[in-house]
Amino acid sequence: MTNSIQFIDGCWEAGEGQLFKSIDPARNEVIWSGEAASETQVEKAILAARAAFPDWSGRSVEERLAICQKFSELLEENKEHLARTMAKETGKPVWETRTEVGAMMGKVAISERAYHERTGTVENDMPGAKAFIRHKPHGVVAVYGPYNFPGHLPNGHIVPALIAGNTVVFKPSELTPMVAQETVKLWEKAGIPAGVLNLVQGEVDTGKALSAHPQIDGLYFTGSSNTGHLLHKQFGGRPDKILALEMGGNNPLLVTNVADVDAAVHNIVQSAFITSGQRCTCARRLFIEDSEQGRAVLERLIEVTENILVDDYEADPQPFMGAMISAKAAGEMVDAQNELLHKGAKSLVRMKQTDSKKGFVTPGIVDVTGVEDLPDEEHFGPLLKVYRFKDIDAAIKEANNTRYGLSAGVLCDDEQTYRYFFKHIRAGIVNWNKPITGASSAAPFGGIGASGNHRASAYYAADYCAYPVASVEADSMSLPESLAPGLKF
């Protein structure tokens, strides 16, 4: 039976490209299959978005918001179905995918506030006229979604883009096509007009056809640094196109002078191992004071990590960690651990892949203190590297020794230490005594260096979804009392 997985110009249709499949990484079962969108279908989607743009952008923001709010209501009505779809396709526990759907539901209200605050109309009086600042949508924008948050993260681009009046062509991760399909069905049910939101499913060729098409006015990407850099090169010399890149990080978390050891360990675990380490903000490097207290924190961290429950997404009791996105990804994490051990790192908690055909791995901790030539890589999984330090300035210097700059944090009881850390650390998200995976949709989200291109998302997504237009306006004309030199009337 043909699976109509492409949503183009208001209609579902089968892809014309190669067959690809989605596999439940916790159970090694094929749960979805369909044909990729061809280059012709990608162009069809872009032209449909172009044709729909004048009407959609010409509507009042209240009309556009009404459809977005209906979408939010449908998320509420279908939250359990969508959460379980996410769990099957990503391997994340159901308790966690429910929180993702909740974040999607809250995005419309937050994006509405951001639209008015960041891109609203400003009026100022001036002699004989008024000055206005208004904003207009870019046109047709492409949205590329990741697999780790297949609902929430693309939603964070799509909702503000639609509110601003853009039309969208959405290319989700090829690893989570079912979540994308179910999400777009809710947009269809919400009454999104034909061509305003289009879905093109597929693998690399589909993505390349979309990013290379001359008719897109912008591209919003969340994913790996390697892909983001390729897109940046592709858009080089094209200042007419808006490009927003949200990429990863080699994120540091520093611990010093904490009285509550268990609270500190809880924050470390939440920073490093939540979502099986598959958040771009996850702590990859733990800087811990080489002292009696630091050793106590590390010993407790080892104990807690060894007892983290890893299991199926529907298991009862629910696990803290589910499967990674694929058996291949899980195997690559074990390989990354072994490479560090080969370089001289010491295993504190050994990561293991429990089944070579599934995405389950246990969390790992390696001590890399004194190890030379460590790769500045984002190991996208539950692998934490420990650096012991005696001098906080040296620790901060090493924390900054990365091409990335997404998230960072410090766990300490002294506010002065936090202020010092905040002043000297280079990152777009800096937390104190909270997990560094914690970020608010009511704040900007983004990093510096190889983590982004200065287009923060979340609350600041409104900024790249519209461009400012300055106007000086007068309802009548008259000659000035004093003419400029050299003029005669």
Curated annotation (Swiss-Prot):
Catalyzes the NAD-dependent reduction of succinylglutamate semialdehyde into succinylglutamate. One of its GO terms (molecular function) is succinylglutamate-semialdehyde dehydrogenase activity. Belongs to the aldehyde dehydrogenase family. AstD subfamily. PANTHER family: ALDEHYDE DEHYDROGENASE-RELATED. Transmembrane segments: none annotated. The active site is at 246, 280. Its EC number is 1.2.1.71. Pathway: Amino-acid degradation; L-arginine degradation via AST pathway; L-glutamate and succinate from L-arginine: step 4/5. This is N-succinylglutamate 5-semialdehyde dehydrogenase. It comes from the Bacteria. It is an enzyme of class 1 (oxidoreductase). NCBIfam families: arg_catab_astD (TIGR03240), PRK09457.1 (NF006992). One of its GO terms (biological process) is arginine catabolic process to glutamate. NAD(+) binds at residues 223-228. Coiled coil: none annotated. InterPro entries: Ald_DH/histidinol_DH (IPR016161), Ald_DH_C (IPR016163), Ald_DH_CS_CYS (IPR016160), Ald_DH_CS_GLU (IPR029510), Ald_DH_N (IPR016162), Aldehyde_DH_dom (IPR015590), SuccinylGlu_semiald_DH_AstD (IPR017649). It catalyses: N-succinyl-L-glutamate 5-semialdehyde + NAD(+) + H2O = N-succinyl-L-glutamate + NADH + 2 H(+). Keywords: Arginine metabolism, NAD, Oxidoreductase.
